[in-house]
Design a protein with these regions (language model features):
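Acetyl-CoA-dependent GNAT
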Residues: 3, 7, 11-112, 124-125, ...
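C-terminal "cap" of GNAT-fold acetyltransferases
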Residues: 3-7, 26, 45, 101, ...
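Conserved glycine-rich acetyl-CoA-binding loop
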Residues: 107-125, 132-134, 139, 145-152, ...
Length: 179
């Protein structure tokens, strides 16, 4: 049994919104990013419709109570450990690249004490599978250079760096992968 065997991945539900917002803010702060600096959070407040209606998906990863600790946001009898989604690139924010026929990963988060255990990799594999099933053949991702773990995560998962840009005080790193 591997550490991620207890992870259950499923589509996000409206009832998950508060837990997703809590995880999002926690993970950003731990990575050195002020959540107020990240463009909008309207997509999270309007889950799951904000992803589904745009042609994407938002997925949550939960652990049963016995496999989790009380630092994780509660979701009924389970706890939220990971979350993330994808949308067509033309459904993103002004500062993001629009690549015809591609989807962009958004809000990839793993609870800080659980990072480095394979949960992010499992979530990413699920999102890649769902994006491919939805007809996308290219996934793009953008992260702040100061989020070192994310900058290392994407190349380790087969993404290649395709450029850098600036948004406010943040240097952004752009990745893509054919799926």
């Amino acid at each position: 049994m591997t550490v991620t065997d207890d992870l259950q991945l499923r589509r996000c539900r409206s009832a998950d919104v508060e837990a997703v917002l809590e995880l999002d803010e926690w993970a950003l702060r731990e990575a050195g990013t002020d959540p107020a600096d990240v463009p909008g959070s309207g997509d999270l407040r309007e889950l799951p419709a904000s992803y589904r209606e745009a042609g994407g998906a938002f997925v949550v990863g939960t652990l049963p109570e016995a496999a989790a600790d009380d630092r994780l946001p509660a979701l009924g009898e389970s706890h939220l450990v990971a979350a993330g989604g994808f949308r067509p690139t033309d459904a993103g924010y002004e500062d993001e690249r629009a690549v015809e026929g591609a989807a962009e990963l958004h809000r990839m988060r793993v609870a800080p004490p659980y990072q480095g255990r394979g949960y992010g990799r499992r979530l990413l594999s699920e999102l890649e599978w769902r994006a491919r099933a939805a007809g996308f053949r290219l996934l793009v991702a953008t992260t702040a250079a100061r989020q070192r773990s994310a900058v290392a995560f994407y190349p380790a998962a087969g993404y290649r760096e395709v450029g850098r840009s600036t948004y406010g005080d943040y240097e952004l790193v752009h990745f893509e992968k054919e799926i």
